[in-house]
């Protein structure tokens, strides 16, 4: 079977079981698997008695494979579509667990879409090491940035397990890890406004936060006032501000 869409198929039974173990701990009213590929996780979910769940697969060849090999008694709903283009109306509007060995090239976009959905409750996702470092980074860390902030403001993130390259076929060039996400109450500011402030701040990482936001068109006086309220110097850089402080900052912009 040909490899398309940057797939690296999970073949390590121990890792498969650890992912499914985590999924069952976080199980919700609806379960959705993204990009099942050959069905390694899907088969394990079904083997443990999970029924009537949904898988979303972009690759027509994989869809045909799944239709031929998944147990019919499990009642698995196969949606042949690009998850990033999926209309949420295709899913039930109930608390949902997402599970996936995420395609590396689309991982950040998929995570953002999932966390933004009002009915997201929990997720168990595998990422390449670089994404894991960015998602878990704190203010002042080397990998801290928008992905860190957007993830941590919407979910409690924990490490499930680390995954070596040999767990896949074909093996990727980098190591991976599995993260669990549990929904938290989002900040009480307009999300798009907060998003634009964060993205503008990190557009010029070598500049001070104040200068970066002024370059983006924000009013210098308002930013200065916000930084004073946060008790941080006007020379602070974007990577030195915590996610919670960005929420406060966005209220002034």
Q: What positions do the PLM features span?
A:
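C-terminal lobe and adjacent flexible extensions of AdoMet/dcAdoMet transferase-like proteins
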Residues: 183, 200-253
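Catalytic cores of RNA-modifying enzymes
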Residues: 1-199, 228, 239, 248
């Amino acid at each position: 079977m040909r490899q398309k869409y940057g797939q690296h198929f999970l073949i390590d039974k121990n890792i498969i079981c650890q992912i499914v173990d985590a999924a069952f701990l976080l199980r919700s009213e609806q379960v959705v698997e993204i990009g099942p590929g050959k069905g390694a996780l899907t088969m394990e979910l079904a083997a443990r008695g999970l029924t009537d769940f949904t898988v979303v697969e972009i690759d027509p060849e994989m869809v045909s494979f799944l239709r031929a090999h998944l147990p019919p008694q499990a009642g698995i709903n196969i949606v042949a579509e690009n998850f990033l283009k999926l209309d949420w109306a295709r899913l039930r509007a109930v608390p949902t667990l997402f599970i996936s060995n995420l395609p590396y090239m689309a991982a950040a976009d998929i995570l953002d879409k999932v966390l933004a959905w009002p009915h997201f409750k929990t997720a168990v996702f595998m990422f390449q090491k670089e994404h894991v470092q960015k998602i878990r980074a704190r203010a002042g860390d080397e990998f801290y940035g928008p992905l860190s902030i957007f993830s941590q403001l919407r979910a409690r993130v924990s490490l499930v397990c680390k995954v070596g390259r040999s767990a896949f076929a074909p093996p990727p060039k980098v190591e991976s890890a599995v993260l669990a996400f549990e929904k938290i109450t989002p900040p009480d500011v307009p999300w798009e406004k907060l998003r634009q402030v964060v993205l503008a701040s990190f557009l010029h990482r070598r500049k001070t936060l104040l200068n970066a936001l002024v370059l983006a068109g924000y009013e210098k006086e308002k930013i200065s006032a916000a930084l004073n309220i946060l008790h941080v110097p006007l020379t602070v850089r974007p990577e030195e501000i915590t996610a919670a402080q960005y929420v406060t900052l966005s209220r002034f912009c």
